[in-house]
């Protein structure tokens, strides 16, 4: 897009007046994750020249975090490309040679599934026993049948019996238990094992949905999340390579690192003719959750505008710089919005959007990597899954803080060892993950080693030589891993979260001042990397289309 001229002299709205003076709209993107980079790149490719990306942390990538240890790359954040057919992340990775060559058989398997017979997942009890393979397969088939039923409530508009039953966890637990108890062929001992396995599978589901518990995931909305067909893939060189490819077309000066935002002052033009409508702040009014750059009661300092200029939005940064803009694309996580929405936007958000932020869910899923000198597991083993026999009748997935380790569902074996060494990757989610994040490495390594000894029945397992783990819940720039539709929410809330501000159209009010993207704003693909990327492109497309309609290209 070249510099723009109004298509009619009568246009006197704020955007038209600004463009007559400047020729280009100014867009500020908050966040340099997949959504933010995708939005910035799309705008730049369409000729927008006044684009700035503000990233709070010291690096781009957001919830993509690839860590190099020795010759191997480990993913603390996004790990898999979920599906291939029409997945923009997959096509970007494939076009740039980032994917491994796989056989047809490997393509059909995709990533290791804990719910299938592919590979050898070792299900172990806290008494040091391995659950027989036939019992695991029977339970897996049963669980999959019930899992498919959970999809039908949304897809076939099936009514939920009661609001208290509008929970994936409650429905699944009760349905699977009833089928196990009513099976005339299983002896009581086998039934007890299968009943205990329910909780383990629900822990895995909770990790995959990034909820504290599947009891908190809406049954009526669960089936709206859409899986892209095709195999799941990892990127051996690291998921950050996708981020780097996105950033390649973005000039270095566009992205500012270490630049946390304190507040977005929007609807400025309709409130006063010029200058930022920013009230002085005291200590009590300062938002303390936006990182270390906070300046307390320090007065904001002037930003990048002429005093005679008029801007709809002013972005106030933690270093007190004020950046005026025509449009701001907000890509911060739902966790950050939940924690900071009251102080992050002035004026405050509309009631409808606040309600959507409250209703939608986001939790923490963390990984624990343990590296050993030698493997203590067999070459055929692809994972060690932990089944607590005393949880056969349990109705909760919440544990006291001192028992946080019970939420670890198991450890996957990273393959091949030639690439990773002898490494196990553990999974934990929810409030228990937050407790784990507060522990030091030594304590977590010790507890995990004791669990491995207990469940394998091998007291001689040594402590790992190295531990690496994520901490998404306590990171002030994320406050969680990814979103889900919580009980009481629906896809309509995702749409409300994504709706640009202001809601009303007026000749005195500039449109699309604040736009929202990020995985939590994609109705079908929330929680995924492709959902994040597509949401960034979606918001860029809104602006591209608006300026295409409002203005003709200049020469």
Curated annotation (Swiss-Prot):
Binds 1 FAD per subunit. This is Spermine oxidase. Pfam families: Amino_oxidase. Induction: By antitumor polyamine analogs. It catalyses: spermine + O2 + H2O = 3-aminopropanal + spermidine + H2O2. The keyword Nucleus applies. InterPro entries: Amino_oxidase (IPR002937), FAD/NAD-bd_sf (IPR036188), Flavin_monoamine_oxidase (IPR050281). Inhibited at more than 90% by SL-11144, SL-11150 and SL-11158, at concentrations less than 1 uM. Keywords: Cytoplasm, FAD, Flavoprotein, Nucleus, Oxidoreductase. Flavoenzyme which catalyzes the oxidation of spermine to spermidine. Can also use N(1)-acetylspermine and spermidine as substrates, with different affinity depending on the isoform (isozyme) and on the experimental conditions. Plays an important role in the regulation of polyamine intracellular concentration and has the potential to act as a determinant of cellular sensitivity to the antitumor polyamine analogs. May contribute to beta-alanine production via aldehyde dehydrogenase conversion of 3-amino-propanal. One of its GO terms (cellular component) is cytoplasm. The gene is SMOX.
């Amino acid at each position: 897009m070249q510099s723009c001229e109004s298509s009619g002299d009568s246009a006197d709205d704020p955007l038209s007046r600004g463009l007559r003076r400047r020729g280009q709209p100014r867009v500020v993107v908050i966040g340099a994750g997949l959504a933010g980079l995708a939005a910035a790149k799309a705008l730049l490719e369409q000729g927008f020249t006044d684009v700035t990306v503000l990233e709070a942390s010291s690096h781009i990538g957001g919830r993509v975090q690839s860590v190099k240890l020795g010759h191997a790359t480990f993913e603390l954040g996004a790990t898999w490309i979920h599906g291939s057919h029409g997945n923009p992340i997959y096509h970007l990775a494939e076009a740039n040679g980032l994917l491994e060559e796989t056989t047809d058989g490997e393509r059909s398997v995709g990533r290791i599934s804990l719910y299938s017979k592919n590979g050898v997942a070792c299900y172990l009890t806290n008494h040091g026993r391995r659950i027989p393979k036939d019992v695991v397969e029977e339970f897996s088939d049963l669980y999959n049948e019930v899992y498919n039923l959970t999809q039908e409530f949304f897809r076939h508009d099936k009514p939920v019996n009661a609001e208290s039953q509008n929970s994936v966890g409650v429905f699944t637990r009760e349905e699977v238990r009833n089928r196990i108890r009513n099976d005339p062929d299983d002896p009581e001992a086998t039934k007890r094992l299968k009943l205990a396995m329910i909780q383990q599978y629900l822990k895995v589901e909770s990790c995959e949905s990034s909820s504290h518990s599947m009891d908190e995931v809406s049954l009526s909305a669960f089936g709206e999340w859409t899986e892209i067909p095709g195999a799941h893939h990892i990127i051996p060189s690291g998921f950050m390579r996708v981020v780097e490819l996105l950033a390649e077309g973005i000039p270095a000066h566009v992205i500012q690192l270490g630049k946390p935002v304190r507040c977005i002052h929007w609807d400025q033009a309709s409130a006063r003719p010029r200058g930022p409508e920013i009230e002085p702040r005291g200590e009590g009014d300062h938002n303390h959750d936006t990182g270390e750059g906070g300046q307390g009661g320090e007065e904001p300092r002037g930003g990048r505008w002429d005093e005679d200029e008029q801007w709809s939005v002013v972005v106030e940064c933690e270093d007190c710089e004020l950046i005026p803009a025509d449009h701001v694309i907000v890509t911060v996580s739902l966790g950050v919005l939940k924690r900071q929405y009251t102080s992050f936007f002035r004026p405050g958000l509309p009631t409808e959007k606040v309600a959507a932020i409250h209703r939608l869910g986001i939790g923490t899923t963390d990984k624990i990597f343990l590296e050993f000198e030698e493997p203590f597991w067999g070459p055929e083993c692809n994972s060690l899954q932990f089944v607590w026999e005393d949880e056969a009748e349990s109705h909760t997935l919440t544990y006291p803080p001192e028992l946080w380790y019970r939420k670890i569902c198991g450890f996957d074996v990273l393959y091949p060892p030639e690439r990773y060494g002898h490494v196990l990757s553990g999974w934990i989610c929810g409030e228990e993950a937050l407790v784990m994040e507060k522990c030091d490495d030594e304590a977590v390594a010790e507890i995990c080693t004791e669990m491995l000894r207990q469940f394998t029945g091998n007291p001689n397992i040594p402590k790992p030589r190295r531990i690496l783990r994520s901490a998404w819940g306590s990171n002030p720039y994320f406050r969680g891993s990814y979103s889900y539709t919580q009980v009481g929410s629906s896809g309509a809330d995702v749409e409300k979260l994504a709706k640009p501000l202001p809601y009303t159209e007026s000749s005195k009010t500039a449109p699309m001042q604040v736009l929202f993207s990020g995985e939590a704003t994609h109705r079908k693909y929330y929680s995924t990397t492709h959902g994040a990327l597509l949401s960034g492109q979606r918001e860029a497309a809104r602006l591209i289309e608006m300026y295409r309609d409002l203005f003709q290209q200049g020469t």
